[in-house]
């Protein structure tokens, strides 16, 4: 089993030293879901939501969040992201929104946390914009779908 990289021999949390690592192209994809009532989803899809374009706002929030991950999660490194993409899809047959994020860079550490943060904050933004209409929406699951690059190699969720 692998060891935790953020904990030293004394059990104290520290930011990992990546200064000796080689720069490689790294990419990560994550997804999140927001489950809601059909009426709430219809407000979003039809563009009739009183707060405006829910998907556009959630997309921008997710992108901004990816860029601020280092500021939100204490042991994450500040990264020079080269790409952040957030896609939102209404799945009307299941009364949910699927959010997929992609983050990419050429660097010394991975972008999994940035992708997860982007998807999570986009989901939270949908909740925030729709909570006046429905308070019992459910966010989840949120998960890493795939990551490439770096020493640990390629990871992909099995279908």
From Swiss-Prot:
Substrate binds at residues 75-77, 113-114. Pathway: Cofactor biosynthesis; molybdopterin biosynthesis. InterPro entries: MoaC, MoaC_bact/euk, MoaC_sf, MoCo_biosynth_MoaA/MoaC, Mopterin_CF_biosynth-C_dom. Coiled coil: none annotated. It catalyses: (8S)-3',8-cyclo-7,8-dihydroguanosine 5'-triphosphate = cyclic pyranopterin phosphate + diphosphate. The active site is at residue 128. GO terms for biological process: Mo-molybdopterin cofactor biosynthetic process. It holds the Pfam family MoaC. Keywords: Lyase, Molybdenum cofactor biosynthesis. GO terms for molecular function: cyclic pyranopterin monophosphate synthase activity; GTP 3',8'-cyclase activity. It comes from the Bacteria. Its EC number is 4.6.1.17. NCBIfam families: moaC, PRK09364.1. Catalyzes the conversion of (8S)-3',8-cyclo-7,8-dihydroguanosine 5'-triphosphate to cyclic pyranopterin monophosphate (cPMP). Belongs to the MoaC family. Homohexamer; trimer of dimers. This is Cyclic pyranopterin monophosphate synthase. The lineage of its organism: Bacteria, Pseudomonadati, Pseudomonadota, Gammaproteobacteria, Vibrionales.
